[in-house]
């Protein structure tokens, strides 16, 4: 279910403050965050945000096509390595 249009998009306060500070300085530095639920807003475009996937922080460069999506969508949490091989020869 989509979020109501009456409400604003959710962005963590600490993340919003860091982005505003970097926009006023016009500097580029990697922003580390654990907030996967934050929505990408237009002020984030051009920044690199390191999103936590449960084990490490993955640096993601924010583009204009990502606006409206959540940060967690771009940092996968599980690594699928394929189904287990049916190894009948080793059981004998």
Swiss-Prot record:
The keyword Ribosomal protein applies. Its main location: plastid. Pfam families: Ribosomal_S19 (PF00203). InterPro entries: Ribosomal_uS19, Ribosomal_uS19_bac-type, Ribosomal_uS19_CS, Ribosomal_uS19_SF. Gene3D superfamilies: 30s Ribosomal Protein S19, Chain A. NCBIfam families: rpsS_bact. PANTHER family: RIBOSOMAL PROTEIN S19P FAMILY MEMBER (PTHR11880), SMALL RIBOSOMAL SUBUNIT PROTEIN US19M (PTHR11880:SF8). Protein S19 forms a complex with S13 that binds strongly to the 16S ribosomal RNA. This is Small ribosomal subunit protein uS19c. It comes from Gossypium hirsutum. The lineage of its organism: Eukaryota, Viridiplantae, Streptophyta, Embryophyta, Tracheophyta. The gene is rps19.
């Amino acid at each position: 279910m989509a979020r109501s249009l009456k409400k604003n998009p959710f962005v963590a306060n600490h993340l919003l403050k860091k982005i505003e500070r970097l926009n006023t300085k016009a500097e580029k530095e990697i922003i580390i965050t654990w907030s996967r639920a934050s929505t990408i807003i237009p002020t984030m475009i051009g920044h690199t945000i390191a999103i936590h996937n449960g084990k490490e922080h993955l640096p993601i460069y924010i583009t204009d096509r990502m606006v409206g999506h959540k940060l967690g969508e771009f940092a996968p949490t599980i690594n699928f390595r394929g189904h287990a091989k049916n190894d009948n020869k080793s059981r004998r």
